[in-house]
Swiss-Prot record:
Keywords: Chaperone, Cytoplasm, Protein transport, Translocation, Transport. One of the proteins required for the normal export of preproteins out of the cell cytoplasm. It is a molecular chaperone that binds to a subset of precursor proteins, maintaining them in a translocation-competent state. It also specifically binds to its receptor SecA. Pfam families: SecB. InterPro entries: SecB, SecB-like_sf. This is Protein-export protein SecB. Homotetramer, a dimer of dimers. One homotetramer interacts with 1 SecA dimer. Transmembrane segments: none annotated. GO terms for molecular function: unfolded protein binding. NCBIfam families: PRK05751.1-4, secB. Belongs to the SecB family.
Length: 167
């Protein structure tokens, strides 16, 4: 254990990369059952939709709040059976990295850490609402990040091409 501490101290003294979880917390949780009692008296197989977003802000030098926003909706016949919205957040200390590496860490490692907490909170609130368990599939945040970067680059190229044809 002291060897690990010595390595961490040496990394910090040398200005090496640093990443630490300071706190994980539930920032907001909302649960709705728009169908009311109908949700429990009729037989149906709802369609589950999952929407995901990541927000981050720098709280102070080297300290970032990362919020995983997750919305899970169950629908049947275009009617919402239930709706769960959660903001699972964490404070992360990040140092010794440049801008692009920090952005990647915030959009991949941080949500990867937060997701199991959000998934458990969603499952728990659905259980309390008398719904069956919902096992959300794992999310590959690295792939989501790469896809978002690719889409942003394509959009920038499209806008640049449109700007050149106008001039």
């Amino acid at each position: 254990m002291s060897d690990e501490n010595n390595q961490q101290d040496a990394q910090q003294a040398a200005g090496g990369p640093q990443f630490a979880i300071q706190r994980i917390y539930l920032k907001d949780l909302s649960f709705e059952t728009p169908m009311g009692v109908e949700a429990f008296t009729k037989a149906f197989k709802p369609n589950i939709q999952q929407d995901l977003n990541i927000q981050a802000n720098q709280v102070e030098e080297g300290l970032f709040e990362v919020v995983l926003l997750l919305t899970v909706t169950a629908r049947t016949d275009n009617r919402a059976v239930f709706l769960v919205e959660i903001k699972q957040a964490g404070l992360f200390a990040i140092g010794g990295l440049e801008g692009g590496a920090v952005t990647q860490l915030i959009n991949t490692a941080c949500p990867q850490i937060l997701f199991p907490y959000a998934r458990e909170a969603i499952d728990s609130i659905l259980n309390r609402g008398s719904f069956p368990p919902l096992m959300l599939p794992p999310i590959n945040f690295d792939a989501v990040f790469v896809q978002a970067i690719s889409q942003a680059q394509q959009q920038a190229e499209t806008e640049k091409a449109q700007g050149e044809t106008i001039n």
